[in-house]
């Protein structure tokens, strides 16, 4: 049997009947679950698909990153592109922490792989160090999620360690050529993707998205393929296999517990606020779970929920009086706008700002928040993807959902360590709808799995007094200890 290793797919060409039988047997043994929409039944159904596909020419093929599932290793064809000594002699090596050096060296032994590193571990520095280890004649593509503010933040850091002519960027209307091309995921089609011999993907949990997936499939000359994320997998079976297939397996992990023990992350006090709304109860809506009409649940129990909004406003009163800042994470623009209006009416106009993925000048707004120009930042999913907010010390998760990726990305925005800093996180256990309640349960499960502890607080009676008691007995006392 012939095996043709390529940077995207590995092909298996049977030369006789025995080879065909071996490959057919392999194909049956590497099967995964996949959700597919059934237009007749109008719902998603579980189907089983094989990782080892067959084309019309009876040639079998698999994404090269999935070779370990066939008990095979991808050849180390990247070694001629790597110079470890060059990295160790560079000034950036001295700035790296011990766990960063360990992760980088282990990753560089392989032509492809992922570093699973919790938020606040310095993934951008690891990416820069790997670029230093790659020889100077090798063109590198760095893929950044779609938000311009995140790309600008990355470019700014790179220019501290690389010469200006080395660094290029590609986003929106902005373009500059360079050996190290930092590109927004939405602008990849503008590039000649075959040109790059190394591809590094930040926030690689986004790889299954069509724009990034198609781009990585077109990077046929990229012998080096690395991914970085605090939550690289955990979407679904099918999407996880796409990520691994295009970038390789997780090679190294940097956990919250490791950073906490070494003092490289902020301590976290996580509260889950258990409540039931006092202004309405609808048995039909409690049992409601039709995803097509899901907006009704969101509007009733999130957007129009006066009790939930009151809890947020009471928390903000103590947060502001304690001279702390706060990030409020929302899922929908209308929720963010509504909270912004409520906060301005209850406090003052200049204390809060709302930003979303389509808000102009997001980077400037985040810098102003970080410098203390205003105290409360309300943001949508933009804030989940690597935005650097080192001074953030309080988070209110006003959104819903059960995704481990989203939850950990949100917490991660406040994990940047500072002397005397304690990160307070407030989450909700919504008891008015069974699906929302299930979402809360899933979030608690993910917290425990990732090494975070939490405390449940019941808010069933006098909201104002109970929030006051929570703040002075559980929050302020903890802050004094730090």
Regions found by a protein language model. Name each.
Residues 168-170, 174-176, 327, 337-338, ...:
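Conserved helicase ATPase core of P-loop NTP-dependent helicases/translocases
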């Amino acid at each position: 049997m012939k095996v043709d290793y390529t940077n995207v797919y590995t092909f298996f060409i049977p030369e006789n009947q025995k080879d065909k039988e071996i490959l057919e047997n392999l194909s049956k043994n590497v099967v995964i679950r996949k959700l597919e929409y059934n237009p007749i039944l109008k719902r998603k159904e579980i189907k089983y698909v094989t990782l080892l596909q067959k084309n019309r020419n009876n040639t079998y093929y698999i994404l090269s990153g999935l070779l370990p599932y066939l008990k095979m290793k991808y050849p180390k064809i990247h070694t001629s592109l790597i110079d470890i000594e060059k990295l160790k002699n560079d000034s950036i090596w001295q700035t790296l922490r011990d766990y960063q050096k360990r992760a980088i060296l282990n990753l560089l032994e392989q032509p492809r792989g992922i570093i699973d590193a919790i938020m606040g571990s310095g993934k951008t520095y690891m990416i820069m160090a790997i670029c230093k280890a790659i020889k100077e004649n090798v063109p590198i593509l760095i893929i950044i999620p779609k938000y311009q503010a995140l790309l600008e933040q990355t470019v700014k850091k790179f220019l501290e360690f690389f010469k200006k002519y080395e660094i290029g960027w590609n986003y929106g209307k902005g373009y500059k050529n360079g050996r190290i091309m930092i590109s927004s995921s939405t602008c990849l089609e503008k590039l000649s993707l075959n040109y790059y011999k190394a591809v590094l993907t930040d926030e690689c949990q986004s790889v299954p998205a069509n724009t990034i997936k198609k781009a990585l499939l077109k990077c046929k000359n990229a012998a080096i393929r690395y991914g970085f994320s605090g939550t690289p997998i955990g979407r679904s079976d099918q999407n996880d296999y796409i990520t691994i297939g295009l970038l390789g397996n997780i090679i190294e992990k940097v956990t919250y517990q490791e950073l906490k023990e070494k003092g490289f992350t902020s301590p976290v006090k996580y509260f889950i606020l258990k409540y039931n709304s006092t202004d309405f109860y609808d048995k039909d809506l409690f049992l409601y779970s039709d995803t097509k009409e899901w907006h009704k649940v969101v509007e009733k129990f999130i957007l129009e929920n006066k009790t939930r909004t009151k809890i947020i406003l009471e928390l903000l009163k103590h947060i502001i009086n304690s001279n702390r800042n706060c990030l409020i994470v929302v899922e929908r623009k209308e929720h963010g706008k509504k909270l912004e209006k409520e906060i301005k009416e209850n406090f003052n106009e200049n204390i809060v700002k709302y930003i979303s993925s389509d808000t102009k000048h997001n980077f400037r707004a985040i810098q102003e928040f970080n410098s203390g120009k205003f105290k409360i930042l309300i943001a949508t999913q933009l804030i989940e993807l690597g935005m650097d907010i080192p001074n953030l010390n309080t988070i209110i998760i006003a959104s819903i959902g059960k995704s481990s990726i989203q939850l950990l990305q949100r917490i991660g925005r406040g994990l940047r360590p500072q002397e005397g800093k304690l990160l307070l996180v407030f989450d909700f256990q919504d008891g008015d709808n069974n699906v929302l309640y299930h979402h809360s349960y899933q979030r608690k499960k993910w917290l425990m799995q990732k090494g975070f502890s939490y405390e449940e607080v019941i808010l069933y009676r006098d909201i104002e007094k109970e929030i006051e008691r929570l703040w002075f007995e559980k929050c302020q006392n903890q802050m004094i200890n730090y």
